Amino acid sequence: MYIFLDIDGVLNDSQFRWEGLQRQDYSVLIDPKKVELLKKIVEETGSRIVLSSSWGKFWANNPVDSAGKRIDAALEKYGLAVSEKTPQIRNATRSQEIEAFLQNHPYVVSYVILDDNDHGWNRRLRSHWVQTNGSVGLDEEAVALAIDVLRGNLMPVPKETVWERMKRVWKERIYSP
């Protein structure tokens, strides 16, 4: 089981980020309360953490700079660790990076995506996506949903997502006579 983890909007909330940025104290951009909630998911499911955040550029199988080290330090306090990260592919969406990870790890069947933003998830990924409220970050409701998804109870996916509809309409407008 795998957790694809975004950082901003998941392991922090807007107030927490604002306070850290105001003080220019980037070491506090990860909220310990949110890490405790993440630990709950890991303990219940035995999942491994895959960093899918833009913070991944600071973490290359080892933290490569202070931001990567902060990620590791924040997680280590709770007995957690990043095991891998999604590939950083130039001009690719987060959705494409997660797809690339899954193609390179075909044995991964059970996974959840914790992210506050819609990155154009395709239908398969959308059913594994638990969207956090970026203003709130990870909360008890998202934790329960994530555990449920990891246990095989996938998220309902509308027949056509907003993203899919936008792409379809855009193509129709461009290619229609």
Give short role names for the model-derived ranges.
Residues V42-A67:
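Substrate-recognition element of Asp-dependent hydrolases with the DxDx(T/V) motif
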Residues M1-E44:
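Active-site neighborhood of HAD-like aspartate-dependent phosphohydrolases
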Residues M1, T45-S47, Y107-S110:
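Short coil/turn segments at beta-strand junctions that form active-site/ligand-binding loops
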Residues E19, N61, A142:
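Short acidic, gly/pro-rich beta-turn/loop elements at beta-sheet edges
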Residues L5, S52-W55, L114-D116:
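Short His-Asn-centered micro-motif
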Residues G68-P177:
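C-terminal cap/substrate-recognition subdomain and adjoining C-terminal extension
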Residues V28-L29, F58-N62, I89-A92:
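Acidic-and-aromatic substrate-binding clefts and catalytic sites of carbohydrate-active enzymes
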Residues N12-S14, F58-N62, H119-R124, D139:
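Short catalytic/ligand-binding loop motif for oxyanion handling, primarily in non-cytosolic enzymes
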